[in-house]
Amino acid sequence: MSIHSVECNVGTNPITIETGKMARLADGAVVVRSGDTVVLVTVVSATKVKEGQTFFPLSVEYKEKAAAAGMFPGGYFKREGRPTEKEILTCRMTDRPLRPMFPKGYFYDTQVITLLLSADGENEPDILSINGASAACVVSDLPFAEPVGAVRVGRIDGQFVINPTNSQREHSQLDLVFAGTKDQVIMIEGSANELPEEDFIAALRVAQENVKVICEKQEELRAVCGKEKRAYELCLAKPELLEIGYEIAGDRIEEAIYAPSKVERQKKVGALRDEVEAAIKERHPEATDFDVEQVFEYIQKKAFRISIMEKDKRADGRALKQLRPLTAEVNVLPPVVHGSAMFARGETMSLCLATLAPMEERQYMDNYTGSVNEKRFILHYNFPPFSVGDTGRFGGQNRREIGHGALAERSIAPVVPGEQEFPYAIRVSSEIMESNGSTSMASVCAGTMSLLAAGVPLKRPVAGISVGLVTEQNDQHEITSYKTLLDIIGSEDFYGDMDFKLCGTSEGVTGYQLDL
């Protein structure tokens, strides 16, 4: 048994990454430790693509074991049960930086699993999970572009602290999770207590410097014990079908994708897609629906990016920095509802309902890692299928809904009055009425208004906005030019290079989430 390890000297406690001791039948496996917090992270990828597979089936699972904290699980059966909200948020946080590192068209079933084996109550395992997932992929035989590192940044007494302990976080003005490669940000997430813009930017720079150290250590580990990369095939648009697609749609795609309303745009695009499908299947009867979809998506994305970069032209006709029309209304429901508000930005609309209750109604949570175990301010986000004019599953929350709710909650939380000033439990329910991009930011705006309507003495109103990015790159994948978009719609999120959600008050930043 050959065991190899590296130590990353960043933050309050060094991070140790070890491989070769546990889970040796996985494609990649590492044990990551900081203080007495230990996680095992594994990755396994199938060697064949399932028939009919049309996307990259990456699943990321994170599980906290009660034994890790020397505790018994609650409940009658004394076993760990369904994922907690914290586990789901850690899954999302681990997933998002990994996904861009796999090649486009890699459709092999891939699973990353993180198990919390030991929790010391001070060092949070979420950062270890992200670093471990990257390291497991790096030492495996999977096609993984380059290492990803992650750190948490706090700001205590005016000084930035890398990977603060839970005790330190109680006194921090900032809670920033930053994941990236040696020279590029991939994901940021967190909250702040109305942090000034210049301090927020400085925190990002400090985070990038420390992430670089972690990435270099992962490269050292790969050089010593990394496996030879496997052979694989990519599912990409076929050139002969792409040629037919351009014959039919090349001169007409721009007219189809540019319309003031989402419904009109979908109708035009759908009709043109049907023409492309008919032409392709007439000449190539063996072509599948997925082949057609890849061709049309390629053409559509190319047209979108050319129009932004060369013409400054957006799908709904706005200028690059122009907001959609805003509408807002409070007390939209009878007074039996404590506070209600509706906020719409173009075709995105949130209806928020605020409820006050005695402190006994606060939420209590099982906690094995020493972080927050109760909340008196809760925001729940619900995304029914009718909000996009569709049918589908109704009831219960998926990971996306939990993630969006958490973003809106932590963005408003810094302005909620303390328990001594306002001794009530507070719940906001955001019901998405219409969706065409940035529903979480609409939830922040509507949620703030509903709280004010309910009589909650917020320090200041909070607002949120989304920012997009479209880039051009050279053969070395270096950005040569770019355009930023303000208040992005759904297609700009899908075809663009970035979705950056930023919330704050007139005094500073309160919440944020960025994905590339």
Residue positions per predicted region:
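Extended amphipathic alpha-helical scaffolds
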Residues: 1-46, 50, 54, 233-372
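Alpha/propeptide regions of enzymes that mature by internal proteolysis
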Residues: 3-4, 8-13, 27, 38, ...
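Glycine-rich, flexible beta-strand/loop modules in the N-terminal catalytic cores of phosphate-handling
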Residues: 27-110, 116-123, 182, 189, ...
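Conserved phosphate/anionic-ligand binding catalytic regions in large, soluble enzymes, centered on
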Residues: 28-30, 38, 123-141, 329-354, ...
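Flexible, glycine/charged-enriched surface loops at secondary-structure junctions
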Residues: 104-110, 145-147, 214-232, 263-264, ...
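Extended, hydrophobic alpha-helical segments in both membrane/secreted and soluble proteins
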Residues: 133, 403-412, 424-453, 458-467
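Mobile "lid/hinge" segments at catalytic clefts and subdomain interfaces of large enzymes
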Residues: 141-260, 451-516
